[in-house]
Amino acid sequence: MNAPDIRKYLNQESIDSDPAETAEWNEAFMDLLASGDSERAKFILDNLVKLANKSQINWVPDLVTPYINTIPVDEQPEFPGDLAIEEKLASLMRWNALAMVARANEAYGELGGHIASYASAADLFEVGFNHFFRARIENNDPKDRGDLVFFQPHSAPGVYARAYLEGRLTDNDLAHYRREITAPEAGAKGLSSYPHPWLMPDFWQFPTGSMGIGPISSIYHARFMRYLTDRKLLDCTTRKVWGVFGDGEMDEPESMSALTLASREKLDNLVWVVNCNLQRLDGPVRGNGRIIDELEKLFRGSGWNVIKLVWGSDWDGLFARDTTGALVKAFAQTVDGQMQTFAAKDGSFNRKNFFGQNEELARLAQGMTDEQIDRLKRGGHDLVKIYAAYHAAANHIGQPTVILAHTKKGYGMGNAGQGKMTTHSQKKLDDEALIEYRNRFNLPLTDEQAKSLKFFKPEESGPELKYLKEQRIKLGGQLPRRYSACEKISVPDIQSYAAFAIKAEEKEMSTTMAFVRMLGNLLKDKGLGAKVVPIVADEARTFGMANLFKQVGIYSSVGQRYEPEDIGSVLSYREALDGQILEEGISEAGAIASWTAAATSYSVHGIAMLPFYIYYSMFGFQRIGDAIWAAADQRARGFLLGATSGRT
């Protein structure tokens, strides 16, 4: 293994009081790297950090790495697919998604929809669909129940576009985008604006339209899969949870609030792909900063494995020729607002304003045409780089992984939308823009077909559709797809768990006490008991549920590594690997996310669970109303109980 020249990645803004000594340190470390023993190099660095901390020099290592790809070229795995066909398919998806939204808004201007989001995310979706997202296989093997995929909601048109090429949707269905009520009259399926299981119960699994709900839900679903495995109810060890979310969405408190739970539980079955197109509806996500660097620091500090996917393969040659670190230094001085401007402008502008900053950069661009500069891809648009990132994430052990993918919002929309401030709200394109889009992606459409927004589908016997379907067969079948059938569980007779309440004989009893007694009896039932999931948010003692700690235990992925202070008590605080109670701490959002994961288990995992989430009434709908709505959208089955309200 050749040692990389790390000198060009060093902070060139720092003042070096002794360059000769610095050179000696650099040389020693580079010699260590040259030996090929990366583990030894990591040990030395860790040891130096410990030494610095002991010396109390008030130094903390920077959690932000250079603005380049985490995975170097020489560590990229070989791309396993047909690159030309996959690029063509991604172009077709983009076109049909655009045509769907634009046609809907030409017919009814108030329908709305989004073009630019999927234009930026198409390649991220396609690599997942072609190589990683495993569908559920109809057999008795629990390991074949597929991956869970949370889709960026504004990119829903792209998922419909893929389902169209797969033959799951028709031209007529696409023509009724966002027209669920009138579609049946025309013999079509109405396509919901965002992923809505309630409206499309055989298609969408998870509602992600409300920003932040998807991210936190994906974390608690991944943790619930571990819960099922550890309690030996269902083996989920081979399955993954994938989430494709937006960089703007990361500002939602729900997006960030459970990051440490994911790392604490070592959820290496969880992969997030954050589509960093740098723009939200009104403008830049971080115009005066860099959202990728900010998120890297946040996720790394929360204990996640972070993969930066910043630049495409077109940049590899430039980096190889850059012996002075000019590119890395220029990126470090370029904020997202300016990067958005570069996305919106052409190659001539970028040659002058990026590569023209100094002689070193200018030399790197020598010999490149303006068109070649314009076509320099960001990492999230390069299938080879995306595959490398996904492959590394899928094989990482011991941590959840986030891939920070750099893209252009409205990718390929040219002057009509690429990188424009208003692109999120773009619903229509004029004739000139449509023809430009067709040319940009080399689509087999005539001028008239492009202007009329004709949906395009290759011949069934052609290589494109054959390849698309073969790739999905390898991964288990079509996706997304929602299931509703599951094993039936016998419900115990009411006398077996509630006789004390039915025959109360005028004894006074609070409703909370009655519930807790019923719950305790249900947990003892031989048929249903193991499927009951009690959930609390640090309120069990208030509700008189502490006796359940010892009876069924509190779930902990590491068991109990300490002796509880009250070990001799009948109410002793007992944590266990096979514990049944989900104690979520002071997090109503986490508790409802766990409840939803359990309440939809019949559909997601094919195993019916019965969750009870009991909470202070005043912290109920006021705090988690949106999450309850999302649970209803995905047809959750369980019990929510508003208990004590007021003085506690």
For each of these PLM feature ranges, what is it?
Residues 2-166, 170, 509-525, 536:
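N-terminal amphipathic, basic-rich helices that act as targeting or association modules
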Residues 11, 28-31, 78-86, 104-113, ...:
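Glycine- and acidic
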Residues 76-93, 97-107, 114-265, 288-289, ...:
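Cofactor-binding active-site loop characterized by glycine-rich and histidine/acidic residues
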Residues 153-157, 180-181, 242-252, 275-280, ...:
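Acidic, glycine-rich active-site loops and adjacent beta-strand->loop/helix elements
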Residues 168-186, 263-275, 297-304, 629-647:
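A glycine-rich helix N-cap at a beta->alpha junction
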